[in-house]
Amino acid sequence: MAAEREPPPLGDGKPTDFEDLEDGEDLFTSTVSTLESSPSSPEPASLPAEDISANSNGPKPTEVGLDDDREDLFAEATEEVSLDSPEREPILSSEPSPAVTPVTPTTLIAPRIESKSMSAPVIFDRSREEIEEEANGDIFDIEIGVSDPEKVGDGMNAYMAYRVTTKTSLSMFSKSEFSVKRRFSDFLGLHSKLASKYLHVGYIVPPAPEKSIVGMTKVKVGKEDSSSTEFVEKRRAALERYLQRTVKHPTLLQDPDLRQFLESSELPRAVNTQALSGAGILRMVNKAADAVNKMTIKMNESDAWFEEKQQQFENLDQQLRKLHASVEALVCHRKELSANTAAFAKSAAMLGNSEDHTALSRALSQLAEVEEKIDQLHQEQAFADFYMFSELLSDYIRLIAAVKGVFDHRMKCWQKWEDAQITLLKKREAEAKMMVANKPDKIQQAKNEIREEIEEWEAKVQQGERDFEQISKTIRKEVGRFEKERVKDFKTVIIKYLESLVQTQQQLIKYWEAFLPEAKAIA
């Protein structure tokens, strides 16, 4: 067995751990000490071929009995691998071979793989097709942050301006780092432009945060309090997530309107973005009309994949809404718990001040301090519940609405194609009736007209079929990308959320363990 198997080559580029051994060290002290070998034999200082293969991922060698073949245990390894001899030529093949990476122990491979995954990709001048090919890995060297919310103006004419900072090495941008000031309506205008360009052809455009009339009215006319500050912070975080999702899309990243939004110091004011304007009311009417059309159109779905995905997103939407409501209730519960804990701490402190017993008074005062710290922990955990978990669910509820929107546009595209086919059929029937009519004076002119109309509608039918096939192909690709992003986002947020819970519980344990000696000291 051993004679038929050649040991794997050892690279001479890097010394292995065995070469660091001194001549006097015995490599197989625990195993070879029981063997009866000649003092001049180099077997104890040699590396057997079986031991080399045992460290690899290949098949395990047949187990050798020490009592049966003691003399042949190291017979094949005495000349191939010797730690005492610097020569390694005997273990190399005599046939010419291409350059091979030196074989290293398996324990040294893992750090190299980690270092490769940690290296940041360098992205320079790329075409749209190249960026779309990298969409599966979502490798885009661009970072976007929204910060420094600032109130501009007074009264009902006031608005909030946000600083949008971009850092990138993509050559499509004029600078590697730049920042601009944008108001909320600018974000809505950007989404409106992108949706009008890409939504009807099957691209999933990330939705912008919804406009809140009540919240913004408080910010405009009210003083700065905790509720208005919390509203501004929620909106800032939502705008940042919106831009980050938008620039992750390989097609949207190439759009000139997006680049203008990120780079241009002066941006034309977005129009038709107000909720109570005429355009806002028109959008509401159009949404209602689309809902009615969706109920009346009966599409003969021939693709089982689309039927399955539509049902999947309907169920996912319902479950996300239920979970979001539960998390919102959890956030309210933690805030209420924080308020009750603060009230308890205040009462314990007052009781400690009125207590005559020194040890008990000190213990009550310490208990009040612990409860104040726990109150702070409950507040921090409530923020984590909201900003990590609740906002993620809220974002994906809107994203699923965008996904359902592209499915609706596919249905509209099919309806347009179907209408063109029906019209073409009617034109051909009219031509057939004209051919059997006994009016030779008018038949030639009418025949030419109807033939032109038939050719026109034939072209429309062909175009409708191409559009339907193209939007179906795009939606398949977009849904696959959406699913990958969804799993990645949920994994990241769940891990961070669990880490915050663990950290909170560990801090609680520390607080109570520190207070326990004070309670035991009461005498």
From Swiss-Prot:
Modified residues (N6-acetyllysine): 473
Region of interest called Disordered, as start-end residue ranges on this chain: 1-104
Family: Belongs to the sorting nexin family.
CDD domains: PX_SNX2
Function: Involved in several stages of intracellular trafficking. Interacts with membranes containing phosphatidylinositol 3-phosphate (PtdIns(3P)) or phosphatidylinositol 3,5-bisphosphate (PtdIns(3,5)P2). Acts in part as component of the retromer membrane-deforming SNX-BAR subcomplex. The SNX-BAR retromer mediates retrograde transport of cargo proteins from endosomes to the trans-Golgi network (TGN) and is involved in endosome-to-plasma membrane transport for cargo protein recycling.
BAR domain sequence ranges: 299-523
Pfam name, any one: PX
Organism: Macaca fascicularis (Crab-eating macaque)
Gene: SNX2
Localization terms from the record: Early endosome membrane; Cell projection, Lamellipodium
Principal place of residence: membrane
BP GO annotations: early endosome to Golgi transport; intracellular protein transport; lamellipodium morphogenesis; retrograde transport, endosome to Golgi
InterPro entries: AH/BAR_dom_sf, PX_dom, PX_dom_sf, SNX2_PX, Sorting_nexin_N, Vps5_C
Residue stretches making up the PX domain: 140-269
Binding-site residues for a 1,2-diacyl-sn-glycero-3-phospho-(1D-myo-inositol-3-phosphate), renumbered to this chain: 183, 185, 211, 235
One GO cellular component term: endosome membrane
Name of the protein: Sorting nexin-2
Membrane topology per record: Peripheral membrane protein
Subunit text: Predominantly forms heterodimers with BAR domain-containing sorting nexins SNX5, SNX6 and SNX32; can self-associate to form homodimers. The heterodimers are proposed to self-assemble into helical arrays on the membrane to stabilize and expand local membrane curvature underlying endosomal tubule formation.
Chain positions with Phosphoserine modification: 97, 117, 119, 185, 277
Sorted UniProt keywords: Acetylation, Cell projection, Endosome, Lipid-binding, Membrane, Phosphoprotein, Protein transport, Transport
Region span, Membrane-binding amphipathic helix: 278-295
Positions bearing Phosphothreonine: 101, 104
